[in-house]
Structures are given as C-alpha cells and as structure tokens.
Amino acid sequence: MNLSPREKDKLLISMAAMVARRRLERGVKLNYPEAIALISDFVVEGARDGRAVADLMEAGAHVISRDQVMDGIADMIHDVQVEATFPDGTKLVTVHEPIR
C-alpha cells in the first residue's frame, strides 16, 4: 500500500481520534494530542459529509469540553487548523477556542 505523506497524516489523526473516543467512553481525560486529533477528525469527517466551513468552525468548538481533558489542556489549545477536503476542493478550517 503506497500512501502519500498527507494520506499517512490523515490516517494517523483518524487512529488517534479512535483512541481518544475509546478513552472518553472509559471516562479517561484526554491529553493534548488526543484532543487535537479528536477535533481534527471531526472537521475532516464533517467536510467529507459535505458540511459548510462556517458550520464546522462553530461545531468544532463543541466536540469536547473542559471536563473531558486533563488540567491545563484547554488553556493550551487556542486554535486548531485543519486542511480538509470538501466537495468543491480543499480548504483550511480554523476552530477558535475549541475547548470551552
């Protein structure tokens, strides 16, 4: 299987998001990379489903809450930027203050 670096990155984010979801189901608080992966995966999958950029920017801020991440993590993440493929092309989506 020959994957481009971009495809490998997408796969890694998707796998990290799966791990994060399982940890949340068990009641384990997420660390920095897990929180970023979960939000990023939400945006990428939303784009794939055809959701609008503005919708994903707003909805991405409600994927996880402060009580689902380790202490201090919410304060470390100010913006999450994800390059996602939409039906009309690739766009950069920025989620501001994603953990509220």
From Swiss-Prot:
Does the UniProt entry include the keyword Hydrolase? yes
The subcellular location is: Cytoplasm
Residues annotated as coiled-coil are none
Q: In which pathway does it act?
A: Nitrogen metabolism; urea degradation; CO(2) and NH(3) from urea (urease route): step 1/1
Superkingdom, natural source = Bacteria
Signal peptide from the UniProt entry: none
Cite the entry's keywords alphabetically: Cytoplasm, Hydrolase
Q: What class of enzyme is it?
A: hydrolase
Sorted alphabetically, the Gene Ontology BP terms of this entry are: urea catabolic process
Record keyword Repeat present: no
Molecular function GO labels: nickel cation binding; urease activity
Write the Enzyme Commission number(s) for this entry. Answer: 3.5.1.5
- Provide the assembly information: Heterotrimer of UreA (gamma), UreB (beta) and UreC (alpha) subunits. Three heterotrimers associate to form the active enzyme.
Against HAMAP family, the record matches this protein to: Urease_gamma (MF_00739)
Q: What PANTHER family has UniProt attached to this entry? A: UREASE (PTHR33569:SF1)
Protein name per Swiss-Prot or TrEMBL? Urease subunit gamma
Species, as recorded:
Agrobacterium fabrum (strain C58 / ATCC 33970) (Agrobacterium tumefaciens (strain C58))
What gene codes for this chain?
ureA
